[in-house]
From Swiss-Prot:
This is Fluoride-specific ion channel FluC 1. One of its GO terms (cellular component) is plasma membrane. It is a multi-pass membrane protein. Its main location: membrane. It catalyses: fluoride(in) = fluoride(out). Keywords: Cell membrane, Ion channel, Ion transport, Membrane, Metal-binding, Sodium, Transmembrane, Transmembrane helix, Transport. One of its GO terms (biological process) is cellular detoxification of fluoride. It comes from Methanospirillum hungatei JF-1 (strain ATCC 27890 / DSM 864 / NBRC 100397 / JF-1).
Length: 140
């Protein structure tokens, strides 16, 4: 089954993308649980400490899940989709960032860290500027 949006994407970019309902549902359900868990932790422990705790817990969880899967095959693909891409992915995106940084090695890892921090800060600044300038021009 291929949705129209994916057909358009395929014809424009030449990519073969298909919609897989079961796998998408696993990621979506896990994502729902992870985002609610993150919200609750940040309600209980507001400020940077809550975010720090969420990120560290997410890194521990993704490290356990992925490396347990790689070395011991302990989790099925569906479990990795539900837990990794869904639950942990929505709980924190920092866990994926940390895993990819370690796997990149020292040189590329440093570049990856610097680029993510710089681009992340620039993205927040640009988004903020769009809103601030838009509000002024829209008289909101």
């Amino acid at each position: 089954m291929c949705l129209n949006i994916f057909r358009t994407f395929k014809s424009y970019f030449g990519c073969n993308i298909t919609f897989v309902p079961k796998e998408s549902a696993l990621v979506g359900i896990g994502g729902c649980i992870g985002s609610v868990a993150r919200y609750q932790i940040n309600e209980w422990i507001p400020s940077l400490l809550g975010t720090f705790i969420v990120n560290v817990l997410g890194c521990i969880a993704i490290g356990f899940l992925m490396y347990e899967s790689i070395y011991f095959g302990a989790f099925s693909r569906n479990s990795r989709l539900f837990l990794g891409a869904g639950l942990i992915g929505s709980f924190t995106t920092f866990s994926a960032f940390a895993t990819q940084t370690i796997e990149a090695g020292l040189f590329y890892g440093i570049i990856f860290i610097a680029a993510n921090i710089l681009c992340g800060l620039m993205g927040v600044f640009i988004g903020r500027q769009i809103i601030l300038r838009g509000r002024r021009s829209w008289n909101i």
